[in-house]
């Protein structure tokens, strides 16, 4: 059996491709928004209901998806959810009203809720602790790549055929990836092409809570009663509205505020997502650099990245001070970079403080918190954008991220959740 050096990087590349296609299906509706609103006579508020349907379903399914992944395993669980979102995305082409779009997008959101927990679980299986933020940065970059390629692909499909074809193409690509995932993904213990040296490197570099597979799983109640959970969940609640806004509203923002046509949207709407890619990658490399430069531990280094991203989010918060559309695009690029840098750090923190047997569940619960905020903010945008404009809403997003940075420094302790639970003596977590 031929051994492949550096196989963990091939695995994270496969995870990244899944994230790319998942976010392509997610952002197809945003890129097609001007056409959908015109052809189906959809108002801004009705469009917000479509976005909220996706976000609400994603919110509710986050902990469910995490639990299913922990029970079925990364390979089977992720494949099942990917097939579902592919089918539901293609079925969106059958919608003939905003209500039909909302139902279809809600189904897509429910299935795509597994995407980030699955990526995080795969990263915790395949990477030692010191490289995990890099791995998460790479698979998280897929979210912005998918969002980046959606505008030109969707505009091409609309011009060449119809908006329905855009959803069919996106769904078909995700289905093909799901089949590839079933074929190629394996846990390191089952991967025969993995060298002994790399297997030892992965296992020996993981924290104790990730090395032991026979440990009892923390219950949902124990996770919710742990302050470490809230130290991650609250900042994610405050940060996620920004990413939801970037994914769902930028094309419509360009159309309504600056009068961009479909061609101009295809030319510029992807740019903030390119910078979001850079934020994902750089945000993954910063924690080990901060550890080396400042002598801090892993959790503190993640907090520093979150803080840096929150400060940079002041950029898009000032978008209302400028009338030039190209300055606005530049500020959105800064925001894309900032959010994805801090988002990667927040997501990775779940695998830093929770054990392998509950990491997907914990991430699903923190994700539920994040997407609840995204759902609510989408409704706020739909209700207020046509009256007060988009600028005050971008300012609010900047304030949210700064508050999230404050919370993470005051609530999250610099130790695993198991240690925090044992110190409280109220509800001791199971020993790992």
UniProtKB/Swiss-Prot annotation:
Periplasmic face of the membrane: 33-48, 97-99, 160-164, 258-264, 315-317, 391
The terms under GO molecular function for this entry are: hexuronate transmembrane transporter activity
Name the UniProt key words of this record, in alphabetical order: Cell inner membrane, Cell membrane, Membrane, Signal, Transmembrane, Transmembrane helix, Transport
Q: Which positions carry the signal peptide feature in this UniProt record? A: 1-31
Phenotype when inactivated?
Answer: Mutant is unable to grow on either glucuronate or galacturonate, but is able to grow on fructuronate or tagaturonate.
Q: What induces it?
A: Negatively controlled by ExuR. Repressed by H-NS.
Residues in the Cytoplasmic compartment per record = 70-75, 121-138, 186-236, 286-293, 339-369, 413-432
The source's superkingdom equals Bacteria
Q: Which Pfam families match?
A: MFS_1
* Reactions catalysed, as given in the entry: aldehydo-D-glucuronate(in) + H(+)(in) = aldehydo-D-glucuronate(out) + H(+)(out); aldehydo-D-galacturonate(out) + H(+)(out) = aldehydo-D-galacturonate(in) + H(+)(in); D-glucose(out) + H(+)(out) = D-glucose(in) + H(+)(in)
Q: How does it sit in the membrane?
A: Multi-pass membrane protein
Q: Gene3D superfamilies attached here? A: MFS general substrate transporter like domains (1.20.1250.20)
Q: Where in the cell is it found?
A: Cell inner membrane
> Which residue windows are transmembrane per the record?
49-69, 76-96, 100-120, 139-159, 165-185, 237-257, 265-285, 294-314, 318-338, 370-390, 392-412
One GO BP annotation of this record: hexuronate transmembrane transport
Family of this protein = Belongs to the major facilitator superfamily. Phthalate permease family.
- Entry-linked NCBIfam families: 2A0114 (TIGR00893)
The protein's name is: Hexuronate transporter
Q: Which organism is it from?
A: Escherichia coli (strain K12)
Q: What is the lineage of its organism?
A: Bacteria, Pseudomonadati, Pseudomonadota, Gammaproteobacteria, Enterobacterales
